[in-house]
A protein has these predicted regions:
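S-adenosyl-L-methionine
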Residues: 1-28
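A conserved structural/catalytic subdomain of Rossmann-like adenosyl-cofactor enzymes
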Residues: 19-223
Length: 223
């Protein structure tokens, strides 16, 4: 991917291995920026390796991601290596926003500790190999406010061939919403941690951003 984007080999350090069980960057400094699209709902060893619950990446949440769904294990891994003033943007399978049990406990840890800066709902059919409408979770450690921005960007795309694509204009509108951090009817909502708690730590964008009613209004009297 680096070579395809013409990034000189001297500017990156790539390691081959299992990120979750054999991380290759233990000796590195925390990262100021992390961008990731980890595999969706892949399997991992999870609780079968009892040592992992004491791993400094996963221990703070008090629970491991399910063996059948490693999504939030990757999220915790990245949070661990995020600098105090850094930002992480992670493309996630939508289930991580609402599934219960261990994943619900990890979401609670992330929200209660004010790490979740924004959740962005993306359009469906953006990525090769899946038509799923994924989302982006934006994490920060040093945040001045205690609220989460929810952005519905599900319509921010154009159809090209058999896939949807984010144009430069689509990307800029999404970035502007995140940077301005204000409520916009049917598009963005700024939600307090208390309100998220009352909603059982659900982070689905549709739970907080009401879609616009585009149905045609019919005057019964005129009919």
């Amino acid at each position: 991917n680096m070579f395809l984007h013409d990034v000189n080999f001297s500017n990156f350090d790539i390691a081959l291995g299992d990120t979750l069980t054999e991380p290759a960057h233990w000796d590195d400094q925390p990262f100021d920026a992390i961008v990731s699209n980890p595999p969706y709902s892949t399997k991992w060893v999870g609780k079968d390796d009892i040592a992992l619950i004491n791993d400094p990446r996963f221990a703070p949440a008090g629970v491991l991601a399910p063996k059948s769904k490693a999504d939030l294990a990757f999220t915790m891994h990245m949070l661990h290596w995020l600098a105090e003033d850094g930002t992480a943007a992670i493309v996630e399978f939508p289930g991580v926003l609402y599934r219960g049990a261990a994943e619900g406990k990890i979401r609670r840890y992330l929200v209660e500790n004010n790490f979740v800066h924004a959740v962005i709902q993306l359009p469906p059919d953006l990525f090769f190999g899946t038509t799923i409408a994924t989302c982006i979770i934006v994490l920060k450690k040093a945040r001045p406010d205690h609220s989460v921005l929810f952005v519905d960007a599900s319509a921010e795309c154009v159809r090209e061939g058999n896939k949807n694509r984010l144009t430069a204009e689509n990307q800029q509108r999404i970035l502007s919403l995140v940077s301005e951090r204000q409520a916009v009817d049917h598009v963005a909502a700024l939600v307090s941690i208390d309100d998220i708690k009352d909603n059982d730590w659900n982070l689905s964008v549709s739970s907080y951003v009401e879609p616009e009613d585009t149905r045609e209004q019919v005057d019964i009297v005129e009919l």
